[in-house]
């Protein structure tokens, strides 16, 4: 079990997570997310999706700090694909 307690999400954060879960393992473009969640087309200056993905990641990371759930495909979009974070090695 990854989560031992609930994660308080806003309705928009929940809808974002739900949409990514529906397409689990597939990259969902920012434009698709903007259209499905906010009903509008992407503008190059519109950072709405990025802001909500960041907030959602922060909340999930607090519950499961050893995992990464939302992967970024730079220049394309996001996908929900849980992975273990790499261990950091400190050289003395």
Range-by-range predicted roles:
Residues 6-76:
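Positively charged, aromatic-enriched patches within helix-turn-helix-type DNA-binding elements
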Residues 1-2:
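Short, small-residue-biased leader/transition segments that mark boundaries at the very start
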Residues 66-92:
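Basic, Lys/Arg-enriched C-terminal extension of HTH/homeodomain DNA-binding domains
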């Amino acid at each position: 079990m990854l989560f031992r307690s609930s994660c308080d999400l806003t309705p928009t954060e929940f809808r974002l997570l739900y949409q990514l879960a529906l397409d689990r393992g597939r990259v969902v473009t920012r434009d698709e997310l903007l259209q499905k969640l906010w009903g509008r087309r992407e503008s190059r200056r519109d950072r709405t999706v990025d802001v909500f993905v960041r907030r959602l990641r922060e909340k999930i990371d607090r519950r499961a700090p050893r995992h990464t759930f939302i992967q970024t495909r730079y220049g394309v979009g996001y996908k929900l694909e849980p992975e273990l974070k790499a261990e950091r090695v400190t050289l003395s």
